[in-house]
Amino acid sequence: MKKLLLACAALLGSVSLAVSAHAGGTIVVGASPTPHAEILAEAAKLLKPQGYTLKIVEYSDYVQPNVALDSKELDANYFQHKPYLDDFNAQKGTKLVSLGPVHYEPFGIYAGKAKSLKDLKKGSLVAVPNDATNEGRALLLMEATGLIKLKENAGLAATVRDIAENPLGLKIEEIEAAQLVRSLPDVDVAIINGNYAILGGLKVADALAVESADSLAASTYANILAIRAGDEKRPDLQALYSALVSSEAAAFMKQKYAGAVLPSVAK
């Protein structure tokens, strides 16, 4: 009987420790240095009064954060979009899930020789990324601004072959995404990934057009908070996600990144 009571006490103690770890304490999160770790540092300020300490582990690659999350070295990670996570799960056999979207980095149309979209004329040259995912995004932005019309249901897999209408006969040149900023002097406009635009010294505020928060691309490629399947109801992770999508975090993104990083959840 004594042994049974001791065993029960030990079991209750372990359950108590597990619950207390989730109800307060340290949350370990993996992240890319910019902007993810910076946004997490802001979220940490909101978590502290709730009894949570955020430990941020920075990674410079896109594989180890998921490996570490799967092996329980991390409680969550924040660096990727859901299509990447889904592909990682398929390739590695992991069971990681999204707790929700946090932010997106909008594509923009930037001026080259043409200083506004109205300056585009017959045969104007438009540079777009040459990789499949980003080219589709660029073409969807062109469609949203009325420059072209795509075939029905082309979606994010769209290529130049899916252009159904091109009233101005725009010439579309496919260029490596990292080289698009350099191409600006030689083209009329270029459609550039948010990260490359910033690295190239461009300001999103100066873009001729940018993706809207409710666009297919922005919702699909929003950066997410990833966790292990089964952890969705953990109070600490719910608190972390709430902090990341708070009005305070949204204001921080808008102020610090000047449009290059925007909250996925409108505040």
Please place each PLM-identified region on the residue numbering.
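Immediate post-signal peptide segment of exported/extracytoplasmic ligand-binding proteins
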Residues: 20-28, 47-49, 117-123
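Short, well-ordered beta-strand elements
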Residues: 24-34, 52-58, 125-126
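Short helix-initiation/N-cap motifs at beta->coil->alpha
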Residues: 56-67, 154-182
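Beta->alpha turn/N-cap motifs
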Residues: 58-62, 72, 77-86, 102-103, ...
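A conserved helix-loop-strand patch within extracytoplasmic ligand-binding domains
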Residues: 99-148
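A bilobed periplasmic-binding-protein/Venus flytrap-type ligand-binding module shared by bacterial periplasmic
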Residues: 106-117, 221-234
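Periplasmic-binding protein-like
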Residues: 136-143, 244-264
